[in-house]
């Protein structure tokens, strides 16, 4: 443990969308000489990623309340009080100069514990529509960071920072001019894959004229890659289908255009990489936050927003034809995406934390 005055406590859990931006900030804190500790829950992805990063992980017992039965709701106040007490014990032990929450169930009890212990609290919201925990913590926070403008009502605490993403994504890819080669299309469905996209893309690309049809790299998810590859074969479309993408920076650098969901981190990475996109938001995301994320790029012309419910193979093929026949349109969209990126997001968030810590 670092000497008093050099500990920072990060709260993030559940999904990679919360954890990866927090890890980027953890590395920045460490580069500035701070010891980073992590508050999480036993079931989230943080249990794999945080130890891999060499960071001490402290766990509290808390789960979400949405969609739970009446008995769980009756127990909720007692569960939350217990979680706050667990978090308070950890905060008292670590004596951090600052606590920053990136979302997930852990953030609520942890944020309350920080306030009870008199430790400055900063929250960071990755999505264009704020999560429940972050909305509730706004009154307790010393600073509120939003990735996308307009997520929170304007106030003196608010800072628009962007999402911390990997710095290698901001490097300019050296691609040959489109006039000299076929366009390259990257399809992503997240680590588990997106089966609606796995079904839609082979059909849509079969309707794109062969002379315009792009090279395709399709990340289909662990359980869906063989079936997706067979769909492409049956559609007469050549495609490289893989369950995972191990090197995202390389994949983004290879692509000219992306078809994917609209998670907050994905949207921020597309901007960082300067990539045009077709965004098909997850229709059942909480508070429809993926649609709001997608609008950040779509409003400015860096992406096409195509709702899953109204997007069939013909509609997607028409959109792909539109841009594949106009390489200059792809270039314009790419420039717009890059203009919307926030390359200083990580350092800005850390600056804000240390500002409130040492004030």
Swiss-Prot record:
Quote the EC number. Answer: 2.4.1.227
Pathway as given in its UniProt record: Cell wall biogenesis; peptidoglycan biosynthesis
Membrane topology summary: Peripheral membrane protein
GO process terms (BP): carbohydrate metabolic process; cell division; cell wall organization; lipid glycosylation; peptidoglycan biosynthetic process; regulation of cell shape
Q: CDD domains this protein is in?
A: GT28_MurG (cd03785)
- Signal sequence span is none
| Localization per record | Cell inner membrane
Catalytic activity reads: di-trans,octa-cis-undecaprenyl diphospho-N-acetyl-alpha-D-muramoyl-L-alanyl-D-glutamyl-meso-2,6-diaminopimeloyl-D-alanyl-D-alanine + UDP-N-acetyl-alpha-D-glucosamine = di-trans,octa-cis-undecaprenyl diphospho-[N-acetyl-alpha-D-glucosaminyl-(1->4)]-N-acetyl-alpha-D-muramoyl-L-alanyl-D-glutamyl-meso-2,6-diaminopimeloyl-D-alanyl-D-alanine + UDP + H(+)
Q: Which residues bind UDP-N-acetyl-alpha-D-glucosamine?
A: 15-17, 127, 166, 191, 245, 264-269, 290
Name any GO cellular component annotation: plasma membrane
Keywords (alphabetical) are: Cell cycle, Cell division, Cell inner membrane, Cell membrane, Cell shape, Cell wall biogenesis/degradation, Glycosyltransferase, Membrane, Peptidoglycan synthesis, Transferase
Top enzyme class? transferase
State a single Pfam family of this protein.
Glyco_transf_28
Domain of life where this protein originates:
Bacteria
Q: Which GO terms describe its molecular function?
A: UDP-N-acetyl-D-glucosamine:N-acetylmuramoyl-L-alanyl-D-glutamyl-meso-2,6-diaminopimelyl-D-alanyl-D-alanine-diphosphoundecaprenol 4-beta-N-acetylglucosaminlytransferase activity; undecaprenyldiphospho-muramoylpentapeptide beta-N-acetylglucosaminyltransferase activity
Q: What role does this protein play?
A: Cell wall formation. Catalyzes the transfer of a GlcNAc subunit on undecaprenyl-pyrophosphoryl-MurNAc-pentapeptide (lipid intermediate I) to form undecaprenyl-pyrophosphoryl-MurNAc-(pentapeptide)GlcNAc (lipid intermediate II).
Q: Which family does it belong to?
A: Belongs to the glycosyltransferase 28 family. MurG subfamily.
Query: What HAMAP family does the record point to?
Result: MurG
Protein name as it appears in the record: UDP-N-acetylglucosamine--N-acetylmuramyl-(pentapeptide) pyrophosphoryl-undecaprenol N-acetylglucosamine transferase
Tell me what organism the protein belongs to: Pseudomonas entomophila (strain L48)
Q: Which gene encodes it?
A: murG
């Amino acid at each position: 443990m670092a000497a008093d005055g050099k500990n920072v406590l990060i709260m993030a859990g559940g999904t990679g969308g919360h954890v990866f931006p927090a890890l980027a900030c953890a590395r920045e804190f460490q580069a500035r000489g701070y010891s980073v500790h992590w508050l999480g829950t036993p079931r989230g992805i943080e249990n794999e990623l945080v130890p891999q990063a060499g960071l001490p992980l402290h766990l509290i017992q808390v789960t979400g309340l949405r969609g739970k039965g009446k008995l769980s709701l009756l127990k909720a106040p007692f569960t939350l009080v217990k979680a706050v007490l667990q978090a308070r014990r950890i905060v008292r032990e670590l004596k951090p100069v600052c606590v920053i929450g990136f979302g997930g169930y852990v953030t609520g009890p942890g944020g309350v514990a920080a306030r009870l212990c008199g430790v400055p609290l900063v929250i960071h919201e990755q999505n264009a529509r704020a999560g429940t925990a972050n909305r509730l913590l706004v009154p307790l926070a010393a600073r509120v960071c939003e990735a996308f403008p307009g997520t929170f009502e304007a106030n003196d605490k608010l800072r628009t920072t962007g999402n911390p993403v990997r710095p290698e994504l901001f490097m300019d890819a050296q691609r040959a001019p489109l006039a000299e080669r076929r366009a390259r299309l990257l399809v992503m469905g997240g680590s588990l894959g997106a089966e609606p996209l796995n079904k839609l893309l082979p059909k849509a690309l079969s309707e794109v004229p062969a002379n315009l049809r792009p090279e395709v790299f399709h990340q289909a998810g662990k359980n869906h890659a063989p079936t997706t590859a067979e769909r492409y074969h049956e559609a007469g479309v050549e495609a490289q289908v893989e369950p995972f993408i191990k090197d995202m920076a390389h994949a983004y650098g290879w692509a000219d255009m992306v078809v994917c969901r609209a998670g907050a981190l994905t949207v921020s990475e597309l901007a960082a990489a300067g990539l045009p996109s077709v965004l098909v938001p997850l229709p059942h995301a909480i508070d429809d936050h993926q649609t709001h994320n997608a609008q950040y790029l779509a409003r400015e012309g860096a992406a096409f927003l195509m709702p899953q419910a109204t997007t069939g193979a013909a509609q997607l093929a028409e959109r792909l034809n539109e841009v594949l026949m106009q390489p200059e349109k792809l270039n314009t969209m790419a420039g717009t995406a890059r203009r919307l990126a926030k390359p200083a997001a990580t350092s800005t968030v850390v600056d804000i934390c240390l500002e409130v810590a040492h004030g």
